[in-house]
From Swiss-Prot:
Adapter protein that links membrane-bound small G-proteins to cytoplasmic effector proteins. Necessary for CDC42-mediated reorganization of the actin cytoskeleton and for RAC1-mediated membrane ruffling. Involved in the regulation of the actin cytoskeleton by WASF family members and the Arp2/3 complex. Plays a role in neurite growth. Acts syngeristically with ENAH to promote filipodia formation. Plays a role in the reorganization of the actin cytoskeleton in response to bacterial infection. Participates in actin bundling when associated with EPS8, promoting filopodial protrusions. Residues 349-368, 447-458, 473-486 have a biased composition (Polar residues). The modification Phosphoserine is found at residues 262, 324, 326, 337, 347, 367, 385, 396, 455. The IMD domain forms a coiled coil. The isolated domain can induce actin bundling and filopodia formation. In the absence of G-proteins intramolecular interaction between the IMD and the SH3 domain gives rise to an auto-inhibited state of the protein. Interaction of the IMD with RAC1 or CDC42 leads to activation. Keywords: Cell projection, Coiled coil, Cytoplasm, Cytoskeleton, Membrane, Phosphoprotein, SH3 domain. Residues 321-335 have a biased composition (Low complexity). This is BAR/IMD domain-containing adapter protein 2. The keyword Cytoplasm applies. It comes from Rattus norvegicus (Rat). Residues 1-250 form the IMD domain. It is found in: Cytoplasm; Membrane; Cell projection, Filopodium; Cell projection, Ruffle.
Length: 535
């Protein structure tokens, strides 16, 4: 190898070391900084995922409390658990990314800057030393030859000249070998650093592959079952169906009629969730359980009995209407008129019905028949104002407004009708209105059936009648004195007098269609929900 070739290789060696120190290490530091940002972002995703799946578990708890969606709650729990395992795998990948890549690279780059500086300095010092030794031998040989040329006996310097030539040849070989080895060492150092980076990145990729493989395995195993669970939203679980069947077959209970309001299968949703029925009053307790499914008929206000799932109360009242009244409107037309305004459907809990003794003793109330117009619908008069607010399914009206009912019976104290003044339709509290007689006068709305009342307590008393304070409402009004005395607040529901009193009145006035038409209420004063004080 010539001297010029050795010098060129020496420059290449120095360039390799300088490239590592001036380009590779700064780029590696930038890579580590970007990796830390990536790690921070993944940590944020992990934290957000925990909150997300905690919320999913909460939704599963809500579903598990429902009789109709219990298995969907189990599915949500499984989803949360599967994704929790996937998230744990992601956290393991994040730990490996931090420990096996970022930490080790950061340690290497700090040590490497000092190591490379020392290695380059050592190489340059050794190369300079060998080069200086070679230059010294060459200078000595040059002096010797100059002496030999001026001497009278040149043969005297020939042996020594040969020794210098051999020494120069050896030192030049050593320098060339050292430069060659130095270049090889520099390339090896550079390659080792890139190999270390690739090796650590492979470890991260391996953990990432394990993460995705684990997620795929868990999801592929569970996903078909989850999709099957939600394939039919209209299917009622067997457990809920058996429960309804047991309640239907048990003594003193009725078949749930929430799925059908008429022969046209008109579905009417519950407008207000959480409304609870009144307990069975003591006067009616002896009659509960003696139900005859063949003779169950509506008692009052169009409320159907136990076997009335396909019963049409409007059609059944044809005999009670005057001959001048036209046939009632078909349920299919009613469905078209207000089906789009009904609230979201909720399942209705089956409620107890009363025995047929009441049905045989007490005929159906004529209050609803009296309130029917010529179009076959019942009319009521508002005794309090009602504001719907932002709820588009509710009906707003003022005191004194007339409302035409569009459905045959109330739902948990709420009725659906159309205001004759504003022509708007919606749900409204039935206790805010009175049924109109055929002559246009209004009468107090009363209901004997416990299952259709919206009151929150047992307001029936053997001897007294009291109206509770309103459950909601800010303004106070005086209740009409001709019916229930003077009150300062709105009633939420209206109770009826003693059942035994109704039997006596009916026995004395068998010609009347309504045994409670002439019942006079005793004025009372009460400040809370306890028993009223007679004035």
């Amino acid at each position: 190898m010539s001297l010029s070739r050795s010098e060129e290789m020496h420059r290449l060696t120095e360039n390799v070391y300088k490239t590592i120190m001036e380009q590779f290490n700064p780029s590696l530091r930038n890579f580590i900084a970007m990796g830390k940002n990536y790690e921070k972002a993944l940590a944020g995703v992990t934290f957000a995922a925990k909150g997300y799946f905690d919320a999913l578990v909460k939704m599963g708890e809500l579903a598990s409390e429902s009789q109709g969606s219990k298995e969907l709650g189990d599915v949500l729990f499984q989803m949360a658990e599967v994704h929790r395992q996937i998230q744990n795998q992601l956290e393991e990948m994040l730990k490996a990314f931090h420990n096996e890549l970022l930490t080790q690279l950061e340690q290497k780059v700090e040590l490497d800057s000092r190591y490379l500086s020392a290695a380059l300095k050592k190489y340059q010092t050794e190369q300079r030393s060998k080069g200086d030794a070679l230059d010294k031998c060459q200078a000595e040989l040059k002096k010797l030859r100059k002496k030999s040329q001026g001497s009278k006996n040149p043969q005297k310097y020939s042996d020594k000249e040969l020794q210098y030539i051999d020494a120069i040849s050896n030192k030049q070989g050593e320098l060339e070998n050292y430069v060659s080895d130095g270049y090889k060492t520099a390339l090896t150092e550079e390659r080792r650093r890139f190999c270390f980076l690739v090796e650590k990145q492979c470890a991260v990729a391996k953990n990432s592959a394990a993460y995705h493989s684990k997620g795929k395995e868990l999801l592929a195993q569970k996903l078909p079952l989850w999709q099957q669970a939600c394939a039919d939203p209209n299917k009622i679980p067997d457990r809920a169906a058996q429960l309804m069947q047991q309640m239907a077959n048990s003594n003193g209970s009725i078949l749930p009629s929430a799925l059908s309001a008429s022969k046209s299968n008109l579905v009417i949703s519950d407008p207000i969730p959480g409304a609870k029925p009144l307990p069975v009053p003591p006067e009616l307790a002896p009659f509960v359980g003696r139900m005859s499914a063949q003779e169950n008929v509506p008692v009052m206000n169009g409320v159907a009995g136990a076997d009335s799932e396909d019963y049409n109360p409007w059609a059944d009242r044809k005999a009670a209407q005057p001959k001048s009244l036209s046939p009632p409107q078909s349920q299919s037309k009613l469905s078209d008129s207000y089906s789009n305004t009904l609230p979201v459907r909720k399942s209705v809990t089956p409620k107890n019905s009363y025995a047929t003794t009441e049905n045989k003793t007490l005929p159906r109330s004529s209050s609803m028949a009296a309130g029917l117009e010529r179009n076959g619908r019942m009319r009521v008069k508002a005794i309090f104002s009602h504001a719907a607010g932002d709820n588009s399914t509710l009906l707003s009206f003022k005191e004194g407004d007339l409302i035409t009912l569009l459905v045959p019976e109330a739902r948990d104290g709420w009725h659906y009708g159309e205001s004759e003044k504003t022509k708007m339709r919606g749900w409204f509290p039935f206790s805010y209105t009175r049924v109109l007689d055929s002559d246009g006068s209004d009468r107090l709305h009363m209901s004997l059936q416990q299952g259709k009342s919206s009151s929150t307590g047992n307001l029936l008393d053997k001897d007294d009648l009291a109206l509770p304070p309103p459950d909601y409402g800010t303004s106070s009004r005086a209740f009409p004195s001709q019916t229930a005395g003077t009150f300062k607040q709105r009633p939420y529901s209206v109770a009826v007098p003693a059942f035994s009193q109704g039997l006596d009145d009916y026995g004395a006035r068998s010609v009347s269609r309504n045994p409670f038409a002439n019942v006079h209420l005793k004025p009372t004063v009460t400040n809370d929900r306890s028993a009223p004080l007679l004035s």
